Amino acid sequence: MDIAILNTGCANLTSIQVAIKKLGYDSIVTSDPSIVLKSKKIFLPGVGTALAAMEQLHKKNLINTLKKLTQPILGICLGMQIFSQFSEECKGVKTIGIFDNCFTHLLKSSNLPLPHMGWNHIVFNNLHPLFKNIDKKERFYFVHSYIIPLNKYTLAKTKYGVSFSSVMQKNNFFGVQFHPEKSGDAGAQLLKNFLEI
């Protein structure tokens, strides 16, 4: 299987590549649009700011490439957030716009520290293939200060002061707010499920 990990210059690519390798799959780290378009599965990891990620995607001519994709792609953390239409981060950033009418906001919870960092539960419908063989008691590892509120594309939600989208899907575009590559066996199972979709 051809698996591409998009190199946006805004992510720790080694951890996701190692996690995929442990599942028995090889992957390639690339920012070449022609390789991305030919890949069977694509990962868009992201750490940092929406502005930096969008600048890198624009510089590498990847924004239109991403919009053309028909094969499954998984955005991780910031990777999911930039699938929204707009981010409040950095005084406002127009993002890719896959999840239409969805906006990324600062996580506002008066009595809890930011970033939301550590292990937390996700509430999901286990009939979806992405959650196959994942127990509802499992927890996943989060590190973020911005959220996409609950919306029509939400597959799973998490509460940290307020409830927010922790897993989303629109057609072939999937997103997770947590880091599956740092979430132990449950995270590995979710990656496996995505690769088998």
Swiss-Prot record:
Per the entry, what this protein does is:
IGPS catalyzes the conversion of PRFAR and glutamine to IGP, AICAR and glutamate. The HisH subunit catalyzes the hydrolysis of glutamine to glutamate and ammonia as part of the synthesis of IGP and AICAR. The resulting ammonia molecule is channeled to the active site of HisF.
From which domain of life does this come?
Answer: Bacteria
Cite the annotated pathway.
Answer: Amino-acid biosynthesis; L-histidine biosynthesis; L-histidine from 5-phospho-alpha-D-ribose 1-diphosphate: step 5/9
In the Enzyme Commission scheme, what number(s) does this protein have? 4.3.2.10, 3.5.1.2
Compartments annotated for it: namely: Cytoplasm
Q: What is this protein called?
A: Imidazole glycerol phosphate synthase subunit HisH
InterPro entries according to UniProt: Class_I_gatase-like (IPR029062), GATASE (IPR017926), Imidazole-glycPsynth_HisH (IPR010139)
